[in-house]
């Protein structure tokens, strides 16, 4: 399986894992252990999965603070799937600079289409676009000039 496919699979699993952590308060070690026992992890970028699973809670205030200014409601009023997608994507915007912002947005939109409520992907797209403009300003500007 190609590296991009492994990353996509990790992101799909991360939305589910971050949802479990957010809604159920499940311990991260237990979440990671369940995913390893229930899935064929040879088809997953396990490093990405691990780093983001533990990185989101560790940096939660900064991550939530990245996208909250662009919300039209309180963060706690978001559906938990959209919140998981925004946290995952904001983490990547902040900490995985090697992933182009357009890829981060596209992956977030696709995750929202797959797991989120109807039309959540439009909301996710708008928020992540604003996050990219703020957090990846040089990359966005260079892309717009090209």
Each PLM stretch: what is its role?
Residues 1-114, 118-146:
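N-terminal interaction/assembly modules
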